[in-house]
């Protein structure tokens, strides 16, 4: 690893954004910066105002200090050189620290554009074969064209690779590009559903266009509600609101429809709740229980058996045994034969 120092350019400009310097071992040296490429190691060619950069604008003096270098900046310009936004007196030499900001050219008034040449000073240790901009200083008085900022190859025996294979972009630029690529990452949305009764696997998020087409979960089934719907005609309160008003206003319509496998009990849903539960008034069982009160019960064998209660004695009869229909029992009062005989006498 070679102890080097760098000038990293900040802002606009074409190429030459990173300059890496490695002075010869064991001796100090001087690097010159300015717009005279034939006299300077680093050519500063302004694009906006050429007169703001002197031919030899400033010098970098490097002196060995242990395993590192002591670097100082000296101003030789008429327009000025700034270190951390403080103007350096002409001819004065100032030692630089890692991270200092160097500005070559005058500091513009507030509201104007800053200087084109704005650098950060860095002290680093690098491998020579990783940079094509490691240079040696130009000897004073040398005016050969193209002999300014040129690469220095590694020492004999050190691993090296051809300069043509090196990346043309500066290393600092590559690092900034890799950091900027973090903005391209797209976080995956965390989707979960509430757990009822145990853990569940997370559902796979569907594309936005398919969300509206996803089938909704079926509503939970209520077993008690289902049974009530099967025996909807057994309860006066279960009549729908669309039923005819006479049926809703009649308090003494006592009809029930039983299924053959079901056995009526004292708390049977079809029995009107306005009558007390007692043994004589309990509806007879279907299939094997107490028959209806008709003198000649025919014991209907249908799966669904309809019952009707007498409005006089509150006794239950099979609709088929008394010879009437459910519709007729709903529309008018039902009287059993015994009650009708009592009314006639």
From Swiss-Prot:
Main location: nucleus
Gene Ontology biological process terms in this record: regulation of gene expression
Zinc finger (PHD-type) in chain: 293-342
Occurrences of domain FHA (ranges): 31-88
GO terms, molecular function: zinc ion binding
Pfam families, A to Z: FHA (PF00498), PHD (PF00628)
UniProt-annotated binding residues for Zn(2+) 2: 310, 313, 336, 339
Region called Disordered, residue ranges: 138-167, 190-277
Localization, UniProt: Nucleus
GO cellular component annotations of the record: nucleus
Keyword set, alphabetical order: Metal-binding, Nucleus, Transcription, Transcription regulation, Zinc, Zinc-finger
Classification via PROSITE patterns: FHA_DOMAIN, ZF_PHD_1
Binding annotation for Zn(2+) 1: 296, 298, 318, 321
InterPro entries according to UniProt: FHA_dom (IPR000253), SMAD_FHA_dom_sf (IPR008984), TCF19 (IPR042803), TCF19_PHD (IPR039095), Zinc_finger_PHD-type_CS (IPR019786), Znf_FYVE_PHD (IPR011011), Znf_PHD (IPR001965), Znf_PHD-finger (IPR019787)
Keyword Zinc tagged: yes
General function of this protein: Potential transcription factor that may play a role in the regulation of genes involved in cell cycle G1/S transition. May bind to regulatory elements of genes, including the promoter of the transcription factor FOXO1.
Protein name in UniProt: Transcription factor 19
